[in-house]
Amino acid sequence: MKKQRNLRSMAAQAVEQVVEQGQSLSNILPPLQQKVSDKDKALLQELCFGVLRTLSQLDWLINKLMARPMTGKQRTVHYLIMVGLYQLLYTRIPPHAALAETVEGAVAIKRPQLKGLINGVLRQFQRQQEELLAEFNASDARYLHPSWLLKRLQKAYPEQWQSIIEANNQRPPMWLRVNRTHHSRDSWLALLDEAGMKGFPHADYPDAVRLETPAPVHVLPGFEEGWVTVQDASAQGCMAWLAPQNGEHILDLCAAPGGKTTHILEVAPEAQVVAVDIDEQRLSRVYDNLKRLGMKATVKQGDGRYPSQWCGEQQFDRILLDAPCSATGVIRRHPDIKWLRRDRDIPELAQLQSEILDAIWPHLKSGGILIYATCSVLPEENSLQIKAFLQRTADAELCETGTPEQPGKQNLPGAEEGDGFFYAKLIKK
């Protein structure tokens, strides 16, 4: 039997690691969830994701409710109060239970002497909630985004920035990709219906299904057998542009965790696929995905800037470059991105993308197709990146996606319920 743990203190410590130490929630949360019961896993996730989604609001409230911020060894208490405020504002947990569990969290983090302080701050919020929220809703903090990102979105999308941030602040839907080598989408939807769940097909992407209500993967029909994979609809759109064919040599660059590698093999089972990623740890997930779906690909660790080190002089019929990016299109799915990214990261990422594009282009056969994709919404990483590449690369031609002046196709977060995503299809003359 698993030890009873205080979920509020665990969530507070996880959020502190993200905000103060720059760690990714996707790395921190899974090992924490292993320590709690199945019924508590979802609540722990809700508390972590929810606090990070609304962090600027919770921070603003604490600054109003407390004369001095908690610092040093007491900093975790700041995040514990955030967890308490989040429960009072956004969950159906009865207020008395939210308060009691949060106050008890002080014992779990070895700060029992601060139980009275935590209780006092949360009760003060309850008394002043109406006037505090009215003041908050008139402040810039109401957008729940860091100021540098807000400015970039306002500049890039003067008409749409508000709808982008609204989408970023929502909970994401759960999209699946039906493995067409096992089932048609309709036949798998029938299995889903038999299992007592409901799904909706995407209008444009033939394998995509949106669940009416997100569910654990182990309850999905045939998940362990490889019949279905979790993948956002916008990410599935890459295959429409890549259009892989049997017998071709195809490179999936920056491939981890392998969702697009396996999608290529579902569409073209006899393609010769090479999947490359710089992160050896994340490559283990590519192997896991290939194994679950019963597929084979050549998997290599390598830096996209130096392809000769891992593929020699080899050339490919098609290349999918899912470039390293700011991930500003998937904030609703990974709210920690708002607090992990810095303004200075954007030019650095744009430079890295440029170097990878220039390095990999010679490894595309004449007449071959390269899909440049990111999960960003920032022009510096997307349309401006491709525009500059076309200007300096004589044998590169834009195909089907935009114009030379405004190259690529930009999906914004929430459009057709998908993530923010960018694609550009390039052909080598």
Swiss-Prot record:
One of its GO terms (biological process) is regulation of DNA-templated transcription. InterPro entries: MeTrfase_RsmB-F_NOP2_cat, MeTrfase_RsmB-F_NOP2_dom, NusB-like_sf, NusB_RsmB_TIM44, RCMT, rRNA_ssu_MeTfrase_B, rRNA_ssu_MeTfrase_B_ent, RsmB-like_ferredoxin. The keyword rRNA-binding does not apply. The active site is at C375 (nucleophile). S-adenosyl-L-methionine binds at C254, A255, A256, P257, G258, G259, K260, D277, D303, D322. The keyword Ribosomal protein does not apply. GO terms for molecular function: RNA binding; rRNA (cytosine-C5-)-methyltransferase activity. It catalyses: cytidine(967) in 16S rRNA + S-adenosyl-L-methionine = 5-methylcytidine(967) in 16S rRNA + S-adenosyl-L-homocysteine + H(+). This is Ribosomal RNA small subunit methyltransferase B. The gene is rsmB. GO terms for cellular component: cytosol. Disulfide bonds: none annotated. Gene3D superfamilies: Helix hairpin bin, NusB-like, Sun protein, domain 3, Vaccinia Virus protein VP39. PANTHER family: NOL1_NOP2_SUN FAMILY PROTEIN _ ANTITERMINATION NUSB DOMAIN-CONTAINING PROTEIN, NOP2 YEAST -RELATED NOL1/NOP2/FMU SUN DOMAIN-CONTAINING. It comes from the Bacteria. Belongs to the class I-like SAM-binding methyltransferase superfamily. RsmB/NOP family. Keywords: Cytoplasm, Methyltransferase, RNA-binding, rRNA processing, S-adenosyl-L-methionine, Transferase. It is found in: Cytoplasm. The lineage of its organism: Bacteria, Pseudomonadati, Pseudomonadota, Gammaproteobacteria, Enterobacterales. Its EC number is 2.1.1.176. Specifically methylates the cytosine at position 967 (m5C967) of 16S rRNA.
